[in-house]
Structures are given as structure tokens and as C-alpha cells.
Amino acid sequence: MEEHGVTQTEHMATIEAHAVAQQVQQVHVATYTEHSMLSADEDSPSSPEDTSYDDSDILNSTAADEVTAHLAAAGPVGMAAAAAVATGKKRKRPHVFESNPSIRKRQQTRLLRKLRATLDEYTTRVGQQAIVLCISPSKPNPVFKVFGAAPLENVVRKYKSMILEDLESALAEHAPAPQEVNSELPPLTIDGIPVSVDKMTQAQLRAFIPEMLKYSTGRGKPGWGKESCKPIWWPEDIPWANVRSDVRTEEQKQRVSWTQALRTIVKNCYKQHGREDLLYAFEDQQTQTQATATHSIAHLVPSQTVVQTFSNPDGTVSLIQVGTGATVATLADASELPTTVTVAQVNYSAVADGEVEQNWATLQGGEMTIQTTQASEATQAVASLAEAAVAASQEMQQGATVTMALNSEAAAHAVATLAEATLQGGGQIVLSGETAAAVGALTGVQDANGLVQIPVSMYQTVVTSLAQGNGPVQVAMAPVTTRISDSAVTMDGQAVEVVTLEQ
């Protein structure tokens, strides 16, 4: 009996020992798993397909191209940008360097905002010290932007000078050998990054031209107003005066914009010195990118489709098909839209839930046609309809009609789109700007800022005729009453505005 009790006790002790051993093993497994996860976070490369990243041959790798070579030759800031671009390309990222400084600034703001949100989520969910550090080693004022979890952020700020010094040394090791510059003129750069003259803003041109004159003339000051100091390449139609202000005649201002005149000054100077090659940076790459974007969009969107463009919070632009609400395409940036297009832009505002603007575009023949900077036949047709309506109201007797032919298919489509945009049949077409001024002149009203309102019902005939596939569209309309006002009047909660864009 006692032996049986001892055996049972030993058996229970063995079971408990096995249980303890199993618990210890589980603890070891959990500890190892947690440690391996942290190690993986610390040792893993930035992308799954990468091996341990080696920056010893950044600009000589297959990721380097003409863009990075051009940037690297522009100095320390360009070298830093080239290394960053080459790093992203080596990691198989489908992005390209934005050569337009204005668009690049907008992308920087958008992406920094996204980085802040991602970093806040990471530090909160994971509970690790993490920061974002952005550096551009320009002198004498380098860019050093750091944000993230404290106290790591403060620690990094403390070592700012050391980090900048080490970064400059590392970039200097990879910088290409300086080339002999056989030119008296400086390269066109904005914040150390090369830029094309056609992408420089007016403010940038006004600041650059005096510096350019120092190199071209060899004088410390331009000598504004002194004919003896005027360079031979200076345009004849631009006064030899300080470029900070436009002192041309009103006729000259109407003919050529001040920004375009400033660009002409820069182009003349560089052509005189035989350095046109410095005027256009990344030009070949941008032309190829635009052609690719135009080709891809034309294949994404079916022909004869009416779409709306929507700007998303993340900076992308979506093309939404009218009627179905389906997303036809999403573009990374509005700059990807083709620029060789001309169509009238039609806006309508819904004031019930707050003012909402939607840009309309028409796709014809498989090619995207979005309103940019030119007044097309469509806008002229709408303006002509407005003039006809005014003439009918003033010169014709009650009950008479006015007939007008629209021989342009583009104009007919624009009028049809205009009618579709009006949600209420009793709404009003509101004409503004140049069109309102022209109609105002016909009615004897000299106020160019007034608005002319025309009933939408006059366009129903156009819609019916288009649906039946008839030839030239004739619009018959009864006399209407024109009203000029200082503010837009909303009819039945809707208003339609025809915006005429001029270059």
C-alpha cells in the first residue's frame, strides 16, 4: 500500500515536472519569437527584393540615368537629390523625379503630410521611437527637417552639424569629377536643382536676370536706364529698366505677358553666348513622360464619354464617368493630363449642401479633351446663342423665333453637355466675363462685370436633335428677358456658369 502511494506521488511529480518544462519551453518560444520579430524589423531591407543596401556605387548602378547625372553635376544639392533618386530607382519604385519646381513643391507638401500621418500611426500602434529626417545640404542655409517621437527627435537635432558634415563627406565621395565649364553664364537652378527656363515663375525670373547680367556683362550692377550699359542681345520691345516692374506700354502688355517677356530676355542672353543647352533641363524626359501619359489615358477612357475630374485628398485626380459614377482612371497628379486639348469648361454649383464645383470634360474620338487655356468653338457657340437670345428679346415681336445653325460637332456636344449639367429645367444659364461683356454691349449695358441669365429650355431642341443624330443643329427659341446683376442668382437651387478661358 505504501509502495503504491510512493509510486503515485512520483508519477504526479513527473507530470508536474513535464508541465513546468512545457511552460518554460513556451516562454522560451515566445521570447525567441518576439526577439526575432524585433531583429527582423532592425535588419530587414527597405523592400523585400533588396539585399543589404550598399551605397558605395550609387550613381554607377543601372538605376542611374541622364536625370541623376544631370542632378549630380549641379553641385552638392543636386548630388544629394541624385543619390536619393538613384536609391529609389534601385529599390524598384515606379516614380520619377519631378523637374517642375512648382509641382515638386506641391508634391513635397503632400508627401510630408502623408509621412506625418503614417509616422504618428506607427509610433502609436508599434510603440517605437521613430523619426523622419529630410536634408538638403545647401549652403549657407541647409534644409534640416526632422519630426517624430520624442526624445529621439531632440537627440537628432542635437547632432545636426555632425550629420550634415558626414552627409556632405559621403556625397563628396560619390560626386562626379568637376567638368571644365567653358561658359560665362551660370546654369539655371532653383534651390540648387536644375530647371528649364519655361518652368521658371515670374518671381524666379525677376531674381535671376540681375545675376545673369553680372555674368554676361562682367559688371557688378546692370546699370538700368543707361543706354550705354544695355547689352546688344536685349530685346528691342522691352525697355532697358529694372525687371522688378513692367514699364511697357499697355498695348505691349496685352500682346505679350511679362513672364513671357522675361523668358525671352533669358533666352536671348544664352543664345548670344552660344549656351542654349543650359536653357532646358530634363526636357527630353518630360516630353516622353507626357506622351506616355496621353497614350495611356486615351486607352483607359472609351470614346464619346463624358467625365468629371475630381481632386482627391491624397493629391491624385480621378476621372468619374457622368451617369454611372464609375471611376474611369486615376492619375497621380493633375500634371499628367494632356496639354494639347481645347474644350469649354462648364461648372455648376449646388448650393443646397454648400457650394460644390465640378469640372466637366468631354472625350471624343478616343482623345481626352479637357479645358485648359484656349477659348474653343464650343464657348463661342454658347456666346452666340446668348447674343441671339438677347437680340430676340429686344428686336423681335412677341411670338417670333430666332433660328441659328451649329455646324461644329464640338460646339453641339458642348451645348448638349451644358443642358445635361442643368438639373432643373427651369434653371438659368449664367454668362460671365468676356461673354457677359459682349452681351452687355448688345443690350446697351456697359457694366462688364455683370451676369447675363438665359433660360435653359432653349437648349432642349439641341439635345433632342443630337439624340436623333441629325446634321447641323438648329435652335429655335422664344423671346427672353435679359437681366444684368452684380451677383449670381440661383434658380431652383441650381445655377450653371459658362466660363470662357483665354490664353
Swiss-Prot record:
<dbReference type="GO" id="GO:0042803">
    <property type="term" value="F:protein homodimerization activity"/>
</dbReference>
<keyword id="KW-0010">Activator</keyword>
<keyword id="KW-1017">Isopeptide bond</keyword>
<keyword id="KW-0804">Transcription</keyword>
<feature type="modified residue" description="Phosphoserine; by CK2">
    <location>
        <position position="52"/>
    </location>
</feature>
<feature type="region of interest" description="Required for transcriptional activation">
    <location>
        <begin position="301"/>
        <end position="476"/>
    </location>
</feature>
<feature type="short sequence motif" description="Nuclear localization signal">
    <location>
        <begin position="88"/>
        <end position="116"/>
    </location>
</feature>
<dbReference type="GO" id="GO:0005829">
    <property type="term" value="C:cytosol"/>
</dbReference>
<dbReference type="GO" id="GO:0001228">
    <property type="term" value="F:DNA-binding transcription activator activity, RNA polymerase II-specific"/>
</dbReference>
<keyword id="KW-0597">Phosphoprotein</keyword>
<protein>
    <recommendedName>
        <fullName>Nuclear respiratory factor 1</fullName>
    </recommendedName>
</protein>
<keyword id="KW-0238">DNA-binding</keyword>
<dbReference type="GO" id="GO:0005654">
    <property type="term" value="C:nucleoplasm"/>
</dbReference>
<dbReference type="GO" id="GO:0000981">
    <property type="term" value="F:DNA-binding transcription factor activity, RNA polymerase II-specific"/>
</dbReference>
<keyword id="KW-0539">Nucleus</keyword>
<feature type="region of interest" description="Dimerization">
    <location>
        <begin position="1"/>
        <end position="78"/>
    </location>
</feature>
<dbReference type="GO" id="GO:0000978">
    <property type="term" value="F:RNA polymerase II cis-regulatory region sequence-specific DNA binding"/>
</dbReference>
<dbReference type="GO" id="GO:0070062">
    <property type="term" value="C:extracellular exosome"/>
</dbReference>
<feature type="region of interest" description="Disordered">
    <location>
        <begin position="36"/>
        <end position="57"/>
    </location>
</feature>
<dbReference type="Pfam" id="PF10491">
    <property type="entry name" value="Nrf1_DNA-bind"/>
</dbReference>
<feature type="modified residue" description="Phosphoserine; by CK2">
    <location>
        <position position="47"/>
    </location>
</feature>
<dbReference type="GO" id="GO:0045944">
    <property type="term" value="P:positive regulation of transcription by RNA polymerase II"/>
</dbReference>
<dbReference type="GO" id="GO:0005634">
    <property type="term" value="C:nucleus"/>
</dbReference>
<feature type="DNA-binding region">
    <location>
        <begin position="109"/>
        <end position="305"/>
    </location>
</feature>
<dbReference type="InterPro" id="IPR019525">
    <property type="entry name" value="Nrf1_NLS/DNA-bd_dimer"/>
</dbReference>
<dbReference type="GO" id="GO:0006357">
    <property type="term" value="P:regulation of transcription by RNA polymerase II"/>
</dbReference>
<keyword id="KW-0805">Transcription regulation</keyword>
<feature type="modified residue" description="Phosphoserine; by CK2">
    <location>
        <position position="46"/>
    </location>
</feature>
<comment type="similarity">
    <text>Belongs to the NRF1/Ewg family.</text>
</comment>
<comment type="subunit">
    <text>Homodimer. Binds DNA as a dimer. Interacts with PPRC1.</text>
</comment>
<feature type="modified residue" description="Phosphoserine; by CK2">
    <location>
        <position position="39"/>
    </location>
</feature>
<keyword id="KW-0832">Ubl conjugation</keyword>
<feature type="modified residue" description="Phosphoserine; by CK2">
    <location>
        <position position="44"/>
    </location>
</feature>
<feature type="cross-link" description="Glycyl lysine isopeptide (Lys-Gly) (interchain with G-Cter in SUMO2)">
    <location>
        <position position="139"/>
    </location>
</feature>
<dbReference type="InterPro" id="IPR039142">
    <property type="entry name" value="NRF1/Ewg"/>
</dbReference>
<comment type="function">
    <text>Transcription factor that activates the expression of the EIF2S1 (EIF2-alpha) gene. Links the transcriptional modulation of key metabolic genes to cellular growth and development. Implicated in the control of nuclear genes required for respiration, heme biosynthesis, and mitochondrial DNA transcription and replication.</text>
</comment>
